[in-house]
Amino acid sequence: MMKKLLLALSLLCFSLTALATEGPDELVKRTADDVLAVVKTDKDIQAGDQQKIFALAEEKIVPNFNFDKVSRMVLGKNWTKATLEQKTAFQVEFRTLLIRTYATALSKYRNQTIEYKPMRMAEGATTASVKTQIVQPGGQPIEVNYTLEKQPEAWKVYDIVIEGVSLVTNYRGQFAQEIRQNGLDSLIKKLADKNKAAQAKAASSNAASSNAAPSNTAANQN
């Protein structure tokens, strides 16, 4: 599930300049094509440059993903029981988790393509499901549906369903178990610790790559 989620997220990106009149399927296709064009030509992103990957994620996905709705749905009844401080802390860490997952996926792109299925939507509808299929060279295609909700300014994504498994449902099950056993504060702390560890690892990796570059240049000159 996680590998397929990573792949789906790597192909999902929503433009800051999307028009409110743009349909959900048009938005998905246009912006997915845009982000794939960047990834195909950016060797640093393909090599896993976390700084560039996170910058791309922050620019493209954050303003156009309904993190508030996702957070409420993922926590379920625990959202209504949470304090304002807990809600804020959870949203910060969960948002970071999703961006980090997206960033990891972005560096794993290897010439996948997307096929878009025809979409039917009733006039005046405020929710929509955009159905796609990710085609992998030498591999089985993966069915991915993006669920969007119409906001005053534009359509925004609030769930991704991969081969019948919902991102929201998947995380809700994981988080509910931790909350039952140890409480919401424990979940928030675990997410924060995981995010910090990943950030430190990324910083170390980027530093190592930067230090290696001059050495390689010197070696070539010799």
For the regions a language model picked out, list residue spans one by one.
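Early exported N-terminus immediately downstream of N-terminal targeting peptides
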Residues: 22-102
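Surface-exposed, polar/charged faces of alpha-helical domains
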Residues: 37, 41-48, 52, 81-85, ...
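Surface-exposed, charged secondary-structure patches
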Residues: 100-142, 194-222
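Short beta-strand edge/turn micro-motifs at domain boundaries
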Residues: 143-169
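Sec-dependent N-terminal signal peptides
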Residues: 6-10
